[in-house]
């Protein structure tokens, strides 16, 4: 019996790295897991839709339950559909873990607007989109929920990462507001 038996988790950026590790551990602990990942490289370029499915295959091979999702978390409506898909497929959603991210590192004087926007969109807007749609479900269901948002010590100012630092610091602020706002609904 695992600590997450009967729970349903959605993990963004779950195709590789930290997100993959979290998805696999949550499944090992008994959660059904929605594995969200575009399958892009670290810079957010290209796409391999098989990346999310490969993690689901690992989960299922170990006896767990998984569902692959390759929608971009930067797309508000697609994230809403992803949350609904989790609920339709597994009957509910209990946990959201926002890990997805990309890097476009440059010194501020070398960074263009597109590099700024791409990183902020994935990290900050993507976290907002997922939290927004999941929190509506948590509020309406009235059984609580968990939202886990990943930030980084780079939020405090890492040279060559003005976009990343701003996005990660924004996630800290968003998370504080969510904690203060959603506690009354049992969401922590």
Where do the language-model regions lie?
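Canonical Rossmann dinucleotide-binding motif of NAD(H)/NADP(H)-dependent dehydrogenases/reductases
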Residues: 2-34
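Conserved Rossmann-fold SDR core element
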Residues: 26, 65, 91-94, 182-188
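Conserved glycine-rich Rossmann-like NAD(P)H-binding loop of the short-chain dehydrogenase/reductase
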Residues: 29-53
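The beta1-alpha1 cofactor-binding region of Rossmann-like NAD(H)/NADP(H)-dependent oxidoreductases
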Residues: 49, 70-83, 113
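Substrate-binding pocket helix/loop in short-chain dehydrogenase/reductase
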Residues: 59, 107-108, 112-120
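A short, exposed helix-loop element centered on a Lys and neighboring polar residues
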Residues: 131-132, 176
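Catalytic loop of short-chain dehydrogenase/reductase
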Residues: 139-140, 146-184
